[in-house]
Regions:
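Hydrophobic alpha-helical transmembrane segments
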Residues: 44-59, 177-198, 227-249, 340-364
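Transmembrane alpha-helical segments and their short flanking loops
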Residues: 30-36, 288-378
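Transmembrane alpha-helical segments in integral membrane proteins
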Residues: 57-73, 121, 193-200, 237-267, ...
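Aromatic-rich transmembrane-lumenal/periplasmic boundary elements in polytopic membrane proteins
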Residues: 146-216
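Alpha-helical transmembrane segments and their helix-start/interface "positive-inside/aromatic belt" motifs
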Residues: 1-9, 69-78, 131-144, 180-190, ...
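Early transmembrane hairpin of solute transport permeases
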Residues: 1-128, 295, 313
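Short juxtamembrane and helix-loop transition motifs at transmembrane-helix boundaries
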Residues: 36-47, 68-72, 231-236, 257-271, ...
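Helix-loop-helix junctions within the multi-pass membrane cores of secondary transporters/permeases
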Residues: 215-304, 308
Length: 378
């Protein structure tokens, strides 16, 4: 997957630009008054479309690369890989382009891998017919174009992007107004690293601080009324300040652990790994995830869960003993995750101090596991 890094890096920087400058709640729009999203609306829309195209290309190339490895013969390789690319683009992207649906920025590798095995099985099963009727691939290609048209205009809910949308809706229904007890917050938070490990799409509620819950509104009303907040333990107050630094599983801790371990051992670090740091700092983990083996890697899952659990338990204790004020204020899009706690607490400097301590602790948790990984960061 490292061959796809340039596409992921370009996508990440487009998202960074959009969230910092062009979105409705962009960081500089709210902090500096730069309303570039209004003045350059057409440019913003084109960037959004282009970022979707980049993700489609990345997904399609991922499937194509897996098909190449499974095909294991040079004959018909060009036709097979071309068919794989078109099929992936059709099934994932046609409805997204037509209905302007956002694509999942943390790819569902497991679903795409299963699609590859299904696709290769179909192609190998029809191999003898392809040799007998050379025109059959053209018929399949025309059928795919027709399928793309149907997906874009009438069957969009049955495309893969439609499946992701229904999964997101189902998850939102299940979680309701969000967990408001520390045990339920811990349980929901641990679901994110598990889904990332399994290569399944992670609901947006678990990857970004969500302001859609009623508990957040009630907390803000209580603060403005100078009363005790009714819900001190929520995803916004427990998970968002520390456990989402760099992404689910405290990815920034993993990055710093890999970097410091290689420096300590005197090993070289790849340019791709270094270039993924700034996007990771600005809440875009996709380039970093393409340089680190996360999919079905127990050596990554265990410290991801431990880091999330330890950091959130410490946050619960800090809030319980009133050593920290809960984060209740909404922050702009694109806010670096290391500054979230400081801004969402209305400038509580203790969040910056605890952030350093929490990152060092997560590095310590990841360190022994990084020492066992092979080829990471090279």
């Amino acid at each position: 997957m490292r061959e796809l890094f340039p596409i992921a890096l370009l996508y990440a920087w487009i998202q960074v630009i959009a969230h910092l400058f062009l979105s409705q709640n962009a960081f500089f729009a709210l902090t500096m008054g730069w309303r570039l999203g209004t003045d350059f609306g057409w440019f913003r829309d084109q960037l959004h479309l282009f970022s979707n195209l980049l993700l489609l290309t990345l997904y399609s190339l991922f499937v194509t690369g897996m098909v190449q490895k499974l095909w294991k013969r040079s004959k018909d390789l060009l036709e097979v890989t071309g068919l794989s690319f078109v099929a992936t683009w059709t099934l994932i992207g046609s409805s997204s382009m037509a209905l302007d649906r956002p694509l999942v920025a943390q790819p569902a590798w497991l679903l795409y891998a299963l699609f590859v095995f299904f696709l290769v099985a179909i192609i190998k099963g029809s191999d003898r017919y392809l040799r007998r009727w050379p025109i059959l691939p053209w018929i399949i290609g025309i059928g795919l174009v027709s399928l793309a048209y149907q997906l874009a205009n009438g069957l969009s809910d049955y495309s893969i992007s439609g499946l992701f949308l229904r999964m997101e809706t189902l998850f939102s229904t299940i979680i309701g107004d969000g967990p408001v007890h520390y045990f339920s917050v811990l349980t929901w938070s641990l679901l994110g690293p598990l889904l990332l490990f399994l290569g399944l799409p992670i609901p947006k509620i678990l990857t970004y601080p969500s302001t859609d819950f009623e508990s957040l509104s009630l907390n803000i009303e209580a603060i403005l009324s100078k009363k005790d907040i009714p819900y001190p333990f929520t995803l916004y107050t427990i998970q968002a300040p520390f456990a989402l630094v760099g992404g689910v599983g405290v990815m920034m801790g993993l990055y710093l652990a890999i970097y410091s371990y290689h420096k300590f051992k005197g090993k070289n670090i790849s340019k791709a790994f270094k270039w993924s740091f700034l996007p990771l700092l600005l809440n875009q983990p996709l380039p970093f995830l393409l340089t680190v083996p996360v999919f079905f890697q127990p050596l990554v899952l265990v410290p991801m869960i431990l880091s999330t659990l330890v950091l959130e338990c410490l946050t619960i204790l800090l809030i319980h003993f009133q050593w920290l004020r809960p984060t209740v204020y909404q922050v702009p899009d694109g806010t670096p995750s290391v500054l979230f706690g400081y801004l969402a607490s209305n400038g509580d400097i203790r969040y910056l101090i605890y952030m350093i301590a929490m990152l060092l602790l997560s590095v310590a948790i990841y360190w022994p596991f990084v020492a066992r990984m092979k080829g990471v960061g090279k």
